[in-house]
């Protein structure tokens, strides 16, 4: 291996720094793209879909991630959009229990998606990433995830 001159080491360090920064930008862009894709899927299923199971899955995933990120951003549990998300959580829980009641809960879920749209600018990418990681951990656990988990994130005791 050839020994580098001080100038060569400096160029190598600069290139490694640029590569690391580009990798971080690409990673955060992928997180943004995934959250945006989940948001679009949830909106499509909520507004036009008739598959209640898919609606519960996509909307519930988005709800958990944004509730986690909003909680990390310090949004008050009494914030109107957090209350709307709490109602969305209850509607998704009821819909999961009775998949035939899709029209009864559609308006609450649509309102919750609007609240999510308003809360997303307050959330950091790191918090969204942590929320998606926490969601996957909960879904892969034995206990799973339910309405109570979202209520705890929003700041409401059982």
What are these regions (language model features)?
Residues 10-73, 154:
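Short terminal alpha-helical segments
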Residues 23-30, 34, 58, 87, ...:
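Charge-rich, solvent-exposed alpha-helical interaction surfaces
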Residues 67-120, 127:
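Long, low-complexity or tandemly repetitive, helically biased scaffold regions used
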Residues 100-158:
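Amphipathic alpha-helical binding modules
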Residues 19, 26, 34, 41, ...:
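Acidic-enriched, low-complexity/disordered segments with a strong bias for Aspartate over Glutamate
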Residues 1-4:
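BZIP DNA-binding basic region
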